[in-house]
């Protein structure tokens, strides 16, 4: 099952009331929806909560061009190929690999967010292809788990 397209959709809605963190005031809720399409007709979806939205969307679509034609079920191979772009590679410096030049180090948080959104979408495809919820695909057996949430740190 081959990857045929990767799209990034920036989403933003105004908050009814501002939200505060230690660093900023937020007047809107934003995220990026990542869609990976396959030649088998399956679509996987991932989510990114990082910005700036235009930069992260551009990175997702740039990565999509690099992984087009790869096996959508081989998420580790995709991850390794994209992760290789995050630092200088001896093979690239000698002209011996077919990947683009390394990405700017100052954009590492956005690069890793883009990579993560694609990875989540590939896991979604893997679960759909196996006709299993992801927790079962990963070996989960519990019907209930304890949760904890925090925010605004």
Regions found by a protein language model. Give the residues of each.
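Metal- or metallocofactor-binding catalytic centers and their adjacent structured scaffolds
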Residues: 37-129
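Structured beta-strand/loop patches that form or line metal/cofactor-binding pockets in enzymes
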Residues: 1-49
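Flexible hinge/switch segments at interdomain interfaces of large molecular machines
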Residues: 137-142
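Active-site/binding-pocket entry motifs
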Residues: 9-12, 88, 153
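Short, solvent-exposed polar/charged micro-motifs at secondary-structure junctions
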Residues: 14-17, 86-87, 146-147
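Broad gene-expression machinery/nucleic-acid interaction feature
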Residues: 31-33, 117, 144
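Active-site mouth loops of central-metabolism enzymes
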Residues: 144-153
């Amino acid at each position: 099952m081959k990857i045929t397209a990767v799209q990034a959709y920036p989403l933003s809605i105004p908050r009814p009331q501002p939200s505060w963190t230690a660093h900023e005031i937020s007047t809107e809720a934003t995220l990026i929806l990542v869609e990976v399409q396959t030649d088998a007709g399956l679509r996987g979806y991932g989510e990114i909560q990082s910005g700036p939205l235009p930069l992260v969307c551009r990175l997702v679509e740039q990565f999509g061009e690099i992984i087009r034609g790869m096996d959508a079920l081989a998420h580790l191979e995709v991850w390794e190929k994209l992760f290789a772009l995050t630092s200088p590679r001896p093979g690239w410096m000698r002209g011996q690999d077919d990947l683009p030049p390394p990405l700017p180090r100052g954009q590492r948080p956005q690069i890793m967010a883009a990579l993560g959104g694609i990875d989540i979408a590939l896991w979604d495809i893997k679960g759909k292809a196996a006709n299993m919820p992801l927790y079962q695909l990963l070996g989960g057996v519990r019907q209930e788990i304890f949760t904890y949430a925090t925010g605004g740190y």
